Regions:
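Bacterial N-terminal signal peptides that target proteins for export
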Residues: 2-11
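Bacterial N-terminal signal peptides
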Residues: 10-19
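Acidic, metal/ion-coordinating pockets
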Residues: 22-159
Length: 159
C-alpha cells in the first residue's frame, strides 16, 4: 500500500513538472475579437435618448483605439449588414444599393477582416455580390455554404 502511494506521488510530480514546463515554454497571446452582426444597413447610433449605442462612427473610433493601444483585433461581421429591409423592390432598390455601398466603404475604412454572407446580402443576387467583392478586394466575403451550382466550388472563401 505504501509503495502504491509513492507511485501515485511520483506520477503526480511528473505530471505537474511536464505541464508546468510546457506552460513556461509558450508565451500567451491576447486575442481580441470584434464581432458585429445583423446591422441591417444602420449607419447611425440607435434611437435611445439616453446613452445611444452603435453607429459606424463609434465603431470606427473604438476599433482604432484598440489598434492605437497596440491591440490587433480580428474584426468580423456575422452577416445581414447590407440592407434595412428584406423586401427589395423597384421602389427602394436604388437607395438600398446606395446604403450597401456606404456600408462596404465604411467597413473597408474600419478594416474588417471578414464579412459573412447572410440572407440579406443575397437579396440582390450572387452576381451583385461578386461585383461588390471585386470593388472591395480588401474585404473578405465569407461563406461556407454558397457554391457554384455547375462546379460545386465555393463562390466566396469558406474561411
Amino acid at each position: 500500500m505504501k509503495s502504491n502511494n509513492i507511485f501515485k506521488k511520483e506520477i503526480l510530480l511528473i505530471f505537474i513538472s511536464v505541464f508546468y514546463s510546457c506552460s513556461e515554454a509558450f508565451e500567451q497571446e491576447d486575442i481580441r475579437l470584434v464581432l458585429t452582426g445583423s446591422v441591417h444597413g444602420q449607419l447611425d447610433p440607435c434611437g435611445w435618448k439616453k446613452n445611444p449605442l452603435g453607429g459606424l462612427p463609434r465603431r470606427y473610433t473604438k476599433i482604432n483605439e484598440m489598434r492605437e493601444n497596440g491591440q490587433s483585433p480580428i474584426v468580423l461581421d456575422a452577416g445581414d449588414m447590407f440592407y434595412s429591409t428584406n423586401k427589395i423592390n423597384t421602389n427602394n432598390i436604388k437607395s438600398e444599393k446606395h446604403r450597401c455601398m456606404t456600408m462596404l466603404d465604411a467597413y473597408d475604412k474600419i478594416g474588417y477582416d471578414g464579412i459573412n454572407i447572410g440572407n440579406y446580402e443575397l437579396l440582390t443576387g450572387i452576381d451583385y455580390l461578386i461585383n461588390l467583392q471585386n470593388k472591395f478586394p480588401s474585404l473578405s466575403f465569407l461563406s461556407s455554404n454558397i457554391k457554384n451550382i455547375n462546379t460545386d466550388e465555393f463562390i466566396f472563401s469558406p474561411h
